[in-house]
């Protein structure tokens, strides 16, 4: 099939597919889809988790066609990279040390007591430790708005990371949140480690984390203010 023929034949399918996804009650299947469109020879469908089971589920519950080509991760890729949880008066931490395995998201706090500004964006990624002790990337929707924020000295920024428990079951264990910031035009990869648990009492009774004494109120006895993101008008870092 030529590219032109593919476009002519596939466009009606994309319209039908869009309506099926919008109207489905299987929200977990819809959330597994990060994008779709007419490619060179087929309709490309991008999935967070691209296993045979997920493809079968999509074809049975949403729509099936021989022109569908699925893309995405089938086995989480190995990523044993590490970052910093503090540097020059800048600190990152999870809001709680532990979250439920069924939690839709985890929250993190970036504190700036560096004496100057830093910039940050929306992009993040997560890793988890598997049963063999290997760190792998947690499948998520990696599409983010390309926007930059300025975090002033003495301010904090609260970020949410989606965990997608409805797309893939998250197991109890250790996880890492990675978030890049820019200090004086130099990128720095920050990292905060946290846990997921299926013990309801453990995550319900978990206390909020606090800024280490070294950082708390370190400038003129002033406590940090909360800033959920002040856009600086730039389109990227």
Language-model features, listed with the residues they occupy:
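Short glycine/threonine-rich beta-strand-turn micro-motifs
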Residues: 1-13, 27-58
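N-terminal targeting leaders
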Residues: 2-23, 68-77
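Residues at beta-strand starts and edge strands
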Residues: 41-43, 88, 102-104, 155-157, ...
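Primarily secretory-pathway and cell-envelope proteins
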Residues: 78-145, 150, 180-206, 214, ...
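Surface-exposed edge beta-strands and adjoining flexible/disordered loops or tails in beta-rich
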Residues: 60-76, 129-130
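Short, solvent-exposed, Trp/other aromatic-anchored flexible loops in extracytoplasmic proteins
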Residues: 140-184
């Amino acid at each position: 099939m030529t590219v032109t023929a593919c476009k002519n034949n596939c466009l009606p399918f994309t319209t039908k597919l869009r309506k099926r996804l919008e109207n489905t009650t299987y929200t977990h299947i819809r959330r597994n889809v990060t994008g779709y469109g007419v490619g060179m020879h087929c309709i490309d469908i991008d999935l967070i988790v691209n296993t045979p089971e997920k493809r079968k589920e999509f074809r049975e519950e949403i729509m099936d066609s021989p022109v569908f080509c699925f893309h995405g991760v089938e086995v989480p890729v190995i990523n044993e990279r590490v970052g910093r949880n503090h540097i020059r008066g800048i600190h990152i931490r999870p809001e709680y040390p532990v979250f439920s395995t069924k939690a839709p998201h985890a929250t993190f706090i970036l504190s700036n007591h560096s004496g100057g500004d830093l910039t940050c964006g929306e992009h993040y990624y997560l890793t988890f430790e598997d049963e063999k002790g290997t760190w792998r990337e947690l499948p998520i929707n990696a599409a983010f708005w390309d926007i930059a924020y300025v975090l002033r000295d003495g301010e904090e920024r609260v970020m949410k990371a989606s965990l997608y428990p409805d797309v893939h079951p998250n197991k109890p264990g250790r996880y890492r949140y990675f978030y890049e910031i820019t200090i004086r035009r130099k990128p720095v990869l920050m990292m905060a480690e946290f846990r997921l648990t299926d013990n309801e009492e453990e995550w319900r009774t978990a206390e909020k984390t606090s800024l280490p004494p070294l950082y708390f109120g370190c400038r003129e006895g002033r406590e940090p203010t909360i800033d959920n993101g002040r856009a600086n008008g730039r389109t990227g870092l």
